[in-house]
Amino acid sequence: MGVARHWFAALVGVDPATVATGAAVSQLLAPVAAAVPDGTRVLVPDVEFTSNVFPWAVHTDRGVTVRTAPVDRLADAIARDVDVVAFSAVQSATGEVADVAAISQAARDVGALSVMDTSQAIGWLPVDPNAADLQVCAAYKWLCSPRGTAFLVHHPALAERHPGITSRLRPLAAGWFAGEVPHESYYGPPLRLARDARRFDISPAWHCWVGAAPALQVLAATGAGAIGEHNVALADSFLTALDQPPSNSAIVSVPADDAAVARLTAAGVRFGVRAGRVRVAFHLYSTADDVDMAIGALRG
């Protein structure tokens, strides 16, 4: 697990001491959502994956509210009546890339906590590691890791920017693996949590992390910039073949009827269907032949 943490930190450009490991985005965000004060006002995009919505929404019993705005107008919607801004760097259904810099700066200007889900970005899109206060990522997407692997990055200035929240921020599932020296934390008390982000680690599903470490090493060695150029070039080739304008994303979404969906399935193309549109994505292992196969299936 330490090896996977190291390579993830190298890929993202952060200190490994700021990285907590877990099993899922919602699990890693749960302690953060539990730490916000009663009555906290949360702003999310109107189309946001629920792993970055439900952790906040379950606290409505203590006055926490969640409201929405379109992601392309999210920065403009951030005002003094917003306490937390939770958003994805890349939208999973459409591939829309958020204006991370503008959203993060707008949150900082009003003193709001910014929480960015990078599950659909890290691995192909270089993301400023200093943009958001917290960055959370499911590793089974673009990080090519087994399910059950995820990361949460705490900005080094988190405590300075948000002392109230950080004073209440504590693990909700502390166990031996959250100890300062895990193999000396089998029995207790007293409580002896790690002094860095490892205090939020949970006991790992070992086989998942055995698979994650080499995948992260390959991605870190290749670099998100180079991977992104490759991916977006293939995505644009796909769009051009369909007479669609180019994009800035490795994820594309196009209209498709039931017959086209059936042809894609028969051709062995891996894709998703969201709101009546076919979603395809291209990664470092994708080739021009893959683009041609998908286009051929769509056209029939």
Predicted regions and their residues:
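Pyridoxal 5′-phosphate
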Residues: 1-300
